[in-house]
Amino acid sequence: MPTATNGDVDLFYETAGDGPTVAFVTPAGYGAWCWSWLVEELAGPFETLVWDLRGTGRSDAPRGPYDVATLAADLEAVLSDHGARRAHLVGAGLGGMVALAYAQEHSRAATLALLGTTADGSRVDADALAALQAPRDDPEALRSSLQRAFSDGVVDAHPEIVDRIVEWRTEDDADPDGWAAQREATTEFDATDSLYEVTTPTLVVHGRDDAVVPVAAGRDLADDLPRGSFEGIDAGHLVAAEEPAAVGDLLVGQLDEHGDSEY
């Protein structure tokens, strides 16, 4: 299993499929499990790359605080280790912030897809973000915390899928210190004054029922990006897990439109 290194921090990643690289960046606290369904939509014609943020899963967990610039440097280390000259970046929540910062500071981003994210961490509902965390050894608490991640009724309507998510979370989610460090990185981020620098084609996708980042923040992000476009979906904060087929179709459309000229 490949591991990249940024300074003294080891970063776990894995790939599947062939073709142009699509790299996924997770939201605060969650392991790469949250991309499982979207990876299934894309793997094959594309190479998918998922990795564990520092503080999460099989990557090292140095003490915080963390910031988005450091996490973007971690992403650069992963892409460099893998030998990806260019990559399409898909980030959710904190991961979208990391993708934005990466596009400003590094040269490998071909396109961006930002899911349930904002350029201004002060627009994140800090209480709702904190409510997503639960002890990894408490399955019922993990299950309950998912209510804020999805739209109303989804958790109760799909018990088998939720059981699977709970099992993944016990193994891969951040520990309490990692959660705290990643939450702080989320709420402290502010790129509102520099969005004009991000000329990468960017698709902003937002769940209309997002309880963590208001949908208006996603619309504003798309409006403020030079090459931004916005798509709303009837879903909650984890829009890619709740509606992977719809998100996958949007991503394939973006990659078909912008992919060839970047490779």
Please report, for each region that a protein language model flagged, where it lies by residue.
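Active-site loop/oxyanion-hole signature of alpha/beta-hydrolase fold enzymes
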Residues: V50-V90
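Flexible "cap/lid" loop of the alpha/beta hydrolase fold
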Residues: L100-E140, G178
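Conserved alpha/beta-hydrolase catalytic His-Asp/Glu region
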Residues: S122-R123, L142-S194
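Catalytic active-site module of serine/aspartate enzymes centered on a nucleophile-bearing elbow/loop
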Residues: R227-Y263
